[in-house]
A protein has these predicted regions:
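Conserved AMP-binding/adenylate-forming core of the ANL superfamily
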Residues: 2-3, 7, 20-48, 86-93, ...
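Conserved pre-ATP/AMP-binding loop-to-beta segment of ANL
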Residues: 2-8, 19-20, 98-112, 119, ...
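Conserved AMP-binding/adenylate-forming
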Residues: 29, 44-83
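Conserved AMP-binding A3 loop
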Residues: 32-33, 108-135
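Active-site loops of AMP-binding adenylate-forming
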Residues: 127, 251-271, 295-296, 303-306
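Conserved AMP-binding/adenylation subdomain of ANL enzymes
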Residues: 132-148, 156-196, 210
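Gly/Ser/Thr-rich phosphate-binding loop
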Residues: 195-199, 208-267, 281
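Conserved ATP-binding/catalytic segment of the ANL
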Residues: 288-330
Length: 330
């Protein structure tokens, strides 16, 4: 484990660098990195030694503090979605009961996949994978101190959790959002001076339906839309409204997106799902997408780890053009 990587994923180090920089925004209120670091220090002795540490991950300050504290301790986190019923949560926990708890020493987090087919699988993501994903994202999407990323989706999903790690590494701010509703979401964009936000296509559809006159402020640099394919109709509406949309494609197993719309093209409607991120390799064989790169998971908990440097079968149908554009059909 490199000292540089530990430094990047340390909120205490961030506080030493810029104690007065804004780390968290919430409905107009601000929390600096210095204050956030103190809250993390206060909670460190209370965490216990569970490996992994089970955490119901909500888009709130308590979750944020615990995640950063666990990253500070290099203690693996097991994220559970707050929307699960008690029965669903117990079913997931039962599926991992009895599994070997000897994780790789660099394990950062275990996230359950979306479970579109069968029981969700626990994917092990290392600190290196999270950092590689953040760096690949930042190569296309400029994120720096002063930026604010709205956490409008649960950090129990990789799309939400990656906002925490990207922002920490960039020393930028996270805006904590309430339960999604178009009206409140748009209000928070303004009140918290949001520069980036990540949503799914259904959320964008709801915004257009309930607030057809909405146009983005100059603060908003990009709206990342992913988690599912975006229809051509939705792309066209976004372009007509002058909304800077970055389409994304990725999954839990790749520590977030591996394909994105080029930042310079965010105001234009583009074909497909975007272009391959720097440091990622994607190929299509018989119409199926295979992925290779340092942001890949270690493997699924309880199964053999992935072979380093090998191609990962995404399970998705798609095509890759010669210019690096990827198309994943609806």
């Amino acid at each position: 484990m490199s000292i540089d990587l530990d430094h990047k994923l340390s909120v205490l180090a961030a506080a030493e660098e810029a104690p007065d920089a804004v780390a968290v925004r919430s409905n107009g209120d601000c929390l600096t990195y210095g204050v956030l670091a103190e809250k993390v220090r206060d909670i460190l002795p209370q965490l216990g030694d569970a490996r992994p540490y089970p955490l119901i991950a909500r888009p709130d300050l308590d979750t944020l503090i615990k995640v950063f504290a666990l990253l500070e301790r290099k203690q693996p986190i097991l994220l559970l979605h707050p929307g699960l019923t008690e029965h669903e949560r117990n079913t997931l926990l039962a599926s991992i009961e009895g599994l070997d708890h000897h994780f790789p020493g660099n394990t950062a987090v275990i996230l359950f996949t979306s479970g579109t087919t069968g029981l969700p699988k626990p994917a092990i993501l290392t600190r290196e994978a999270l950092a590689a994903s953040a760096e690949a994202s930042r190569d296309n999407i400029p994120l720096s101190p002063g930026d604010v990323w709205l956490l409008s989706i649960s950090p129990a999903r990789i799309g939400g959790f990656s906002i925490l790690t990207r922002s920490l590494i960039a020393r930028s701010a996270i805006a904590l959002g309430p339960k999604f509703s178009p009206k409140e979401y748009l209000r928070r964009l303004e009140v918290d001076r949001v520069t980036y936000s990540s949503i799914v296509p259904t959320m964008l559809r709801m915004i257009f339906d309930e607030a057809p006159e909405w146009r983005p402020s100059k603060n908003l640099k990009a709206l990342l839309v992913g988690g599912a394919p975006t229809s051509e109709k939705l792309k066209a509406e976004a372009e007509d409204k002058g909304i800077p949309v970055i389409l994304t494609y990725g999954m839990t197993e790749t520590a977030s997106n591996v394909v994105t719309t080029p930042f310079a093209e965010r105001y234009r409607r583009t074909c497909g799902s975007g272009k391959i991120n720097k440091g990622v390799q994607i190929k299509s064989e018989d119409g199926h997408l295979f992925i290779k790169g340092p942001m890949l998971m270690h493997g699924y908990w309880g199964r053999k780890p992935l072979v380093p440097g090998a191609w990962f079968d995404s399970g998705d149908i798609g095509e890759v053009d010669s210019d690096g554009s990827v198309c994943v059909p609806p």
